[in-house]
Structures are given as C-alpha cells and as structure tokens.
Curated annotation (Swiss-Prot):
Gene that encodes it: ruvB
Pfam families (alphabetical): AAA_lid_4, RuvB_C, RuvB_N
Catalyses which reaction(s): ATP + H2O = ADP + phosphate + H(+)
Protein name: Holliday junction branch migration complex subunit RuvB
Role noted for this protein: The RuvA-RuvB-RuvC complex processes Holliday junction (HJ) DNA during genetic recombination and DNA repair, while the RuvA-RuvB complex plays an important role in the rescue of blocked DNA replication forks via replication fork reversal (RFR). RuvA specifically binds to HJ cruciform DNA, conferring on it an open structure. The RuvB hexamer acts as an ATP-dependent pump, pulling dsDNA into and through the RuvAB complex. RuvB forms 2 homohexamers on either side of HJ DNA bound by 1 or 2 RuvA tetramers; 4 subunits per hexamer contact DNA at a time.
Complexes and interactors: Homohexamer. Forms an RuvA(8)-RuvB(12)-Holliday junction (HJ) complex. HJ DNA is sandwiched between 2 RuvA tetramers; dsDNA enters through RuvA and exits via RuvB. An RuvB hexamer assembles on each DNA strand where it exits the tetramer. Each RuvB hexamer is contacted by two RuvA subunits (via domain III) on 2 adjacent RuvB subunits; this complex drives branch migration. In the full resolvosome a probable DNA-RuvA(4)-RuvB(12)-RuvC(2) complex forms which resolves the HJ.
Native source species: Treponema denticola (strain ATCC 35405 / DSM 14222 / CIP 103919 / JCM 8153 / KCTC 15104)
Family affiliation: Belongs to the RuvB family.
Keyword Hydrolase annotated: yes
Predominant cellular place of this UniProt entry's protein: cytoplasm
Length: 343
C-alpha cells in the first residue's frame, strides 16, 4: 500500500492520537452534520429535563467523520460517564457483562464497529437494551440456571461503517438513528482553521480551502494533512501555511487536487484500461489492484462515488466521464461498446 494512502486513509491509525486535543467537546464546537446535531441536541435536552437516560443511539457512516467524537460529546452534554470499546474486544459474554455491570446511572456506552459483534454477544445486548437486565448462566449441565441481574439504565451508542451487516433485531432496538455524510469544503475549511489555532500554527484562508478540497470530505484526513503541511512549512522556515506550501506538500505526498492518491487513480485506470471503463465486479477489481474487497468497498469506493468518479451499478463498477477528464484521458466514443457508460 502506498505511503500517500496512509495520509488520506480515513480509518484511525498510528499518530492520530495527537488529534484528540483537536476534537470538539460540545455540540456547539462540533462542525458539520447539521441535521444530526440539531436533532441530537433536542433529544439530549429532553432526556436531561426528564432525568432519564437518552434513547439508544445508532450512528452510521464512513470512517473518520466524527462518530466516536459525537458519542463522547453526547456523554459530555448529558453530564454522565462514558465507556468505549470496539466490537472485536467483546469476544466472550463475560467481556460484555464486565462492562454492563460497572455502568453508572444513565451513562453512555459506546461500541465501535458494532457490525462485528458475535451473535452471542448481540443476544445479550437485546435484554440489556430493552429491560436493563443481564441474563447470566450459573453452573453447567442439567443443574445450570439463569440469573437475571439488574443493571442501571444506560444509553448504548453503536457506530458502524457497514449498516447492511447489522442485524434487523439489533437495529430495531435503537431509538435514534443518525447517518453521517461527507463534509463540505466549507465545513472542512472551518475545521482546519480551528485545528490550526489549537496547534498554534497560522494558516491562510485560501490555504485552508485548498487543503479542505483534498481532505476527502473527512475531518480526520483534514487534520492529518494539516499536521503534514505544518511539517513542510516548518522545515521551509515559514511561520504560516500558505497556498504554495499546500501545493508543494500535496505534490510531495502524491495527492492531487481532488484528494486522490496513487491507489485511487490506479483503481480508475484499471477499470478504464483493463475493463474498458466497466462494468467490473468488486472482487475482480480488488484482485487487479492487489487489495482486499473489504478495503476497496470501505476505504476507496465511498469517496470515489461521492466525488462523481465512480458508479455502482447492478452489473458492477463503472467510471464516469468526470474520471476520464480528471485523469486527462479521452473517453470512448459511442459505438465502442460503451453506449450506456455516460447515460
């Protein structure tokens, strides 16, 4: 995998812990996701006024858009404790029981990658979410018995990048469902300016906008790129980040004006050069670029589709006219077997 993809990859990676100081701690400071934020503000206020736990919250969206941050903010706004784990860490029922039995009244329990929960763990959650009780089996064999243990009312916040892999029974137990969208350039520019202020580095407005355009609609990528631009500016002896610094830095990282890196362009070129622009199946495409199908679908395709460069069709993946233009290639003429490609 290319080094430039490590910079624009939306999933959390080593070094991103430095961004924790950049994360907003209240809904007022949280940029973007306006509708979700407005709705959540109402639900939180109502729950606080009634002295009740907030309904269970389900967050859906690509990685790096702020799902974990919003879960933490939810706990902050409610004034309650916050516990966090990932679904892969809940390997056995006792792992989940150990957390549920230590929750405090109305606390927020966040499970990331909730689509990866094992069936046995998921079934334990059903009763905990609905009745605030935990079924625990004591003993083995014919003498085994089930004891129901009460737990304090709590709010489960589940986050996923793959909602289609979450079972219907689990989804139905969430009272609030919010979908995260990619951020606009304006929203990302605001996030970059705020982060630059916290990092005590000046960034020109035009430079912030240029950086926002290359951040793949993702705050995590924007903050990561900002740190890299700070490095380039510092080594160049500059006291601020200007457009020239951003342009030179992005070129050095092999990131183009749309935020595409080497593998993005390789995907588009592979479809064009090897499959006449498509359609081509995801499995075949993943093999052709030497990546797993999950990586292709989770980390590459969402932004390529959102940017209007790639289409998912019932027959497979197809590039768009915009992809040809962006790569500086001539699109096929009608009659070359691509009659429906740009319809």
């Amino acid at each position: 995998m290319s080094d430039d993809f490590e910079v624009v990859r939306p999933e959390e990676q080593a070094g991103d812990e430095k961004d924790r100081d950049l994360r907003p701690r209240s809904l007022v400071d949280f940029q973007g996701q306006t509708k979700a934020k407005e709705n959540l503000s109402v639900f939180i206020k109502a729950a606080r006024e009634r002295g009740e736990s907030l309904d269970h919250l389900f967050l859906i969206g690509p990685p790096g858009l702020g799902k974990t941050t919003l879960a933490q903010i939810t706990a902050n706004e409610l004034g309650v404790d916050f516990k966090v784990t990932g679904a892969p860490a809940l390997d056995k029922p006792k792992d989940l029981a150990g957390i549920l039995t230590t929750l405090t009244e109305r606390s927020v329990f966040f499970i990331d990658e909730i689509h990866r929960l094992k069936p046995a763990i998921e079934e334990m959650l059903y009763i905990a979410m609905e009745d605030y009780e935990l079924d625990w089996i004591i003993g083995q064999g014919p003498g085994a018995r089930t004891v129901r243990i009460p737990i304090p009312p709590f709010t489960l916040v589940g986050a996923t990048t793959r909602a289609g892999m979450v079972s219907s029974p689990l989804i139905s137990r969430f009272g609030i469902v919010q979908r995260f969208e990619f951020y606009s350039h304006e929203e990302l520019a605001s996030i970059i300016s705020r982060s630059a202020s916290i990092l005590e580095i000046e960034i020109e407005k035009k430079a912030a906008i240029a950086l926002a355009r290359c951040s793949r609609g993702t705050p995590r990528v924007a903050n990561r790129l900002l740190r890299r631009m700070r490095d380039f500016a510092q080594v160049a002896g500059k006291s601020s980040i200007d457009e020239m610094t951003v342009a030179a830095g992005l070129k050095q990282l092999n990131i183009d004006g749309l935020g595409l890196e080497t593998y993005d362009r390789q995907i588009l070129r592979s479809i064009i050069e090897n499959y006449s622009g498509g359609p081509v199946g995801a499995e075949t495409l993943a093999i052709s670029i030497g990546e797993s199908q999950d990586t292709l679908e989770d980390y590459y395709e969402p932004y390529l589709i959102q940017s209007g460069l790639l289409q998912r069709t019932p027959r497979g993946r197809m590039v768009t006219l915009k992809a040809y233009e962006h790569l500086g290639l001539n699109p096929p003429k009608l009659g070359d077997g691509q009659e429906g490609l740009f319809d």
